From Swiss-Prot:
It is found in: Secreted. Its main location: secreted. This is Uncharacterized secreted protein ARB_05566. It comes from Arthroderma benhamiae (strain ATCC MYA-4681 / CBS 112371) (Trichophyton mentagrophytes). The lineage of its organism: Eukaryota, Fungi, Dikarya, Ascomycota, Pezizomycotina. Residues 1-15 form the signal peptide. It comes from the Eukaryota. Keywords: Secreted, Signal. GO terms for cellular component: extracellular region.
Length: 190
């Protein structure tokens, strides 16, 4: 019985994967945030980028809540929560787009049981920048160590739906997990 309790606790503590997608229905390129703890904002804002159209969550504990935020004038860590959904009996789900073409400035998740908690107990405690950016063709680029101009170019190309063949050659040094590009491309289009 103790082993089961430790496994359940590890699932909650380990974190979830969040993908802030540039397209509808969790398709298209995305910002990748692996192993995000609950109440950490996965920020989708960048210079002129308004945010993510949809958000894919995976490796969540069952019955966790997915949260989508919009930027607010008062700042806050992630903004104001605009949408919240329960993943139910699964560990993954797509948070659909907001009405009126609005985009998510950030996203987070909370463990089961937090819905009844106070609003303060559900607020994000910190913010995390994306680990990588994935283009529509599945090619993945680490953002750490990349110069700001290169990041801006990569963001623009991702939003425009461009692929790795259209990138300048200097981006090749930042490509990661090359062997998974084809599988990611299939997931993006599925």
């Amino acid at each position: 019985m103790k082993v089961f309790a430790y496994i359940a606790l590890a699932t909650v503590v380990a974190g979830a994967n969040i993908r802030n997608h540039f397209g509808d229905n969790c398709k298209g390129g995305y910002l990748d945030y692996p192993n995000i703890a609950q109440r950490i904002c996965a920020s989708a804002l960048h210079d002129k980028i308004k945010g993510a159209v949809t958000v894919a969550f995976s490796q969540l504990p069952q019955h966790s809540y997915m949260n989508g935020y919009q930027n607010t004038r008062d700042g806050g860590i992630c903004g104001s929560r605009q949408k919240q959904q329960n993943v139910g009996n699964t560990d993954h789900k797509c948070l659909p787009k907001l009405a009126g073409g609005a985009e998510y400035a950030g996203s987070s998740w909370t463990a089961p049981g937090f819905k009844a908690a106070s609003e303060k107990d559900m607020e994000c405690t910190s913010e995390m920048a994306p680990h990588a950016l994935v283009l529509n063709d599945g090619h993945k680029y680490a953002l750490g160590g990349m110069e700001k101009d290169m990041i801006n170019t990569l963001y623009s190309m991702a939003i425009e739906g461009k692929g790795f063949q259209e990138l300048p050659t200097e981006f090749g040094a930042f490509e990661i997990e090359k062997e998974g590009a084809q599988q990611r491309a299939q997931e993006i289009k599925a």
